[in-house]
């Protein structure tokens, strides 16, 4: 029923546009006035500023799909060592030979196989120091709190073992979630005072694991149910106390926070960076604790098999797909978008002589964004035009980026890249 409604709505819109378009006998009528996709070609030739306008439309479209008003302001990015280590260890991406992060685009491959793809976000939140000592603070991104189901959530901790340690002794690492202490519970308040929390917070064991203390390595602690409860309560701050009773005896220690880069005085009373990190400091930064969360909400999608559309190669004058790539580095966005390196903002152009065939309203998302952007700018090629050559197949796009809170987010965005074009 929703699909039929969308088709009906599209036909009504097309009918209104056709009724408002100039008649075939109108003076100055041309093939350009028959279809906005034809006007795209004309615009690129007649309007010198068309490419900058297209780029601006693409930027607005990406921000809209990521539910952002403006691009995040990155003042203190996560150290590259920590970023590369986190993405290397998780399935959100891999590090290429050149040191850049490449997204593992599983969602795109699934879309090619016509599988139902659910909108998901994979979020990496690096720990901040908490109170009291040995407490980690995670500020979960708003992106994660808006999604309904936590597929899994894990805290990653690095256990560093002294080279002199030859013991086979295992140590038990425990994670306690700290929460505000309810009023009126005097007995619990006394217990908190014994733990040095002054009765302000209670804590609950949320994960524990016995690990081998013979080698330095990462350890994963699942806390999915705890994060789900936290989000269900409308909260986004997670405080976790880390306990390891036998670590000191076995010569092992948990890297709870990477060492910060030292500051130096520049002689004028201002601080400046104190040079490059040492090898040990670089290693500490790469072992910074983090929380990895995969969250989702289902979105019904229906797929239909279609014949592959035409590519615009300069030799065809019927409805086809025009390739248009926007490099994030060229537009100054590479500081907050980790991967991919750019966006294939393909669109549809050329003439469409065939009759109207209904398509899903969601399929028009990007095409309509570009057309409306030009129409609002008052470019004459788009005045009183009827839509005809439109996307008939789109695929998702995976993005890895920083939000304003310096969290790393991997988001699979539906209907982002035009794959095929056809006549509506």
Swiss-Prot record:
It is found in: Secreted. Coiled coil: none annotated. Disulfide bonds join 312-320, 319-389, 348-421, 352-423. Residues 21-308 form a propeptide. GO terms for cellular component: activin A complex; extracellular region; extracellular space; inhibin A complex. GO terms for molecular function: cytokine activity; growth factor activity; hormone activity. Glycans are attached at residue 165. Residues 1-20 form the signal peptide. Residues 178-200, 260-288 are annotated as: Disordered. SMART domains: TGFB. Residues 263-275 have a biased composition (Basic and acidic residues). Its main location: secreted. GO terms for biological process: activin receptor signaling pathway; hematopoietic progenitor cell differentiation; hemoglobin biosynthetic process; male gonad development; mesoderm development; negative regulation of cell growth; negative regulation of cell population proliferation; negative regulation of G1/S transition of mitotic cell cycle. CDD domains: TGF_beta_INHBA (cd19404). Belongs to the TGF-beta family. This is Inhibin beta A chain. It comes from Gallus gallus.
């Amino acid at each position: 029923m929703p699909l039929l409604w969308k088709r009906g709505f599209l036909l009504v819109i097309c009918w209104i546009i056709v009724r408002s378009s100039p008649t075939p006998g109108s003076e100055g009528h041309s093939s350009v006035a028959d279809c906005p996709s034809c006007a795209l070609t004309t615009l690129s030739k007649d309007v010198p500023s068309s490419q900058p306008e297209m780029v601006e439309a693409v930027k607005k479209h990406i921000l809209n799909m990521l539910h952002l008003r403006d691009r995040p302001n990155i003042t203190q990015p996560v150290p590259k060592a920590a970023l590369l280590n986190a993405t290397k260890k998780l399935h959100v991406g891999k590090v290429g030979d050149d040191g850049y992060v490449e997204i593992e685009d599983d969602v795109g491959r699934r879309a090619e196989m016509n599988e139902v793809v659910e909108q998901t976000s994979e979020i990496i939140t690096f720990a901040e120091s908490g109170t009291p000592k040995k407490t980690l603070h995670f500020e979960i991104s708003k992106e994660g709190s808006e999604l309904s189901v936590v597929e899994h959530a894990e805290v990653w901790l690095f256990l560093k073992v002294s080279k002199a340690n030859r013991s086979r002794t295992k140590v038990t690492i425990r994670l306690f979630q700290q929460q505000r202490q309810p009023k009126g519970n005097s007995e619990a308040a006394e217990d908190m005072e014994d733990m040095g929390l002054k009765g302000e917070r209670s804590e609950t064991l949320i994960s524990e694991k016995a690990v081998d203390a013979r080698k330095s390595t990462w350890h994963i602690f699942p806390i999915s149910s705890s994060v789900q409860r936290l989000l269900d309560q409308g909260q986004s701050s997670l405080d976790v106390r880390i306990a390891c009773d036998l670590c000191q005896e076995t010569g092992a220690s948990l890297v709870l926070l990477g060492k910060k880069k030292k500051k130096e005085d520049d002689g004028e009373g201002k601080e400046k960076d104190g040079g490059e990190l040492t090898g040990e400091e670089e290693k500490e930064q790469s072992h910074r604790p983090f929380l990895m969360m995969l969250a989702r909400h289902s979105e019904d999608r229906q797929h239909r098999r279609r014949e592959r559309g035409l590519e615009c190669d300069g030799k065809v004058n019927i409805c086809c797909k025009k390739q248009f790539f926007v490099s994030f580095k060229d537009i100054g966005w590479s500081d907050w978008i980790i991967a991919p390196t750019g966006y294939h903002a393909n669109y549809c152009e050329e003439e469409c002589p065939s009759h109207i065939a209904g398509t899903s309203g969601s399929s028009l998302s990007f095409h309509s964004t570009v057309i409306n952007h030009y129409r609002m700018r008052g470019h004459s090629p788009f005045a009183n035009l009827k839509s005809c050559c439109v996307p008939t197949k789109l695929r998702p796009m995976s993005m890895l980026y920083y939000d304003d809170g310096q969290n790393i987010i991997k988001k699979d965005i539906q209907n982002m890249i035009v794959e095929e074009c056809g006549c509506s």
